[in-house]
């Protein structure tokens, strides 16, 4: 086993440990621990009944499942799981469709992606930043 260990606590009999859908999958699927309904044009926090500790030097990013977005208009809200968070992980979902979205216990509702972090960057306040080719262009400015 490598030094990278994702420690998972199942908080009830309904919690399901994250799994990878394929050998090369970037993320681990996260499962709903209960039936839940996200109302049309609404939002909700889906229970998972799991807690986890990510490997040292990483954080867990809760990311959307592309199939939910394309097929049902479901988006995943912001989710950053720090290494020292030990509570239940819940998944924030937004329903952008005109009909209620039903989740069944055991459905995959998001994915967990482990990302490396730089935790020792020094913050230095400066008078100005160096010029770059891009400059202050943002929000699609490079795709002209």
From Swiss-Prot:
Pfam families: dUTPase
UniProt keyword Metal-binding present: yes
Listed EC numbers: 3.6.1.23
Binding site for dUMP: 66, 79, 82, 85, 90, 134, 139-140
Enzyme class (EC, first level): hydrolase
Domain of life: Eukaryota
Catalytic activity: dUTP + H2O = dUMP + diphosphate + H(+)
Transmembrane segments: none
GO molecular function annotation: dITP diphosphatase activity; dUTP diphosphatase activity; magnesium ion binding
Record pathway: Pyrimidine metabolism; dUMP biosynthesis; dUMP from dCTP (dUTP route): step 2/2
Keyword annotations: Hydrolase, Magnesium, Metal-binding, Nucleotide metabolism
Cofactors (names): Mg(2+)
GO BP annotations, alphabetical order: dITP catabolic process; dUMP biosynthetic process; dUTP catabolic process
Entry annotated with the keyword Magnesium: yes
Family named by the database record: Belongs to the dUTPase family.
Record note on quaternary structure: Homotrimer.
Cited function: Involved in nucleotide metabolism via production of dUMP, the immediate precursor of thymidine nucleotides, and decreases the intracellular concentration of dUTP so that uracil cannot be incorporated into DNA.
Protein name, as recorded: Deoxyuridine 5'-triphosphate nucleotidohydrolase
């Amino acid at each position: 086993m490598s030094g990278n260990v994702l420690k998972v606590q199942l908080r009830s009999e309904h919690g399901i440990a994250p799994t990878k859908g394929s050998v090369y999958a970037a993320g681990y699927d996260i499962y709903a621990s209960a039936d839940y309904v996200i109302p049309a044009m609404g939002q909700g926090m889906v229970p998972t009944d799991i807690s986890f500790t990510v490997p040292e030097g990483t954080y867990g990013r809760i990311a959307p499942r592309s199939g939910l977005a394309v097929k049902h208009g479901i988006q995943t809200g912001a989710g950053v799981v720090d290494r020292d968070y030990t509570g239940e992980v819940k998944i924030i979902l937004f329903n952008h469709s005109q009909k209620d979205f039903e989740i069944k216990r055991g459905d995959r509702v998001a994915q967990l992606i482990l990302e490396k972090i730089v935790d020792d960057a020094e913050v230095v306040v400066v008078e100005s930043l160096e010029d770059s080719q891009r400059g202050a262009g943002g929000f699609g400015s490079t795709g002209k």
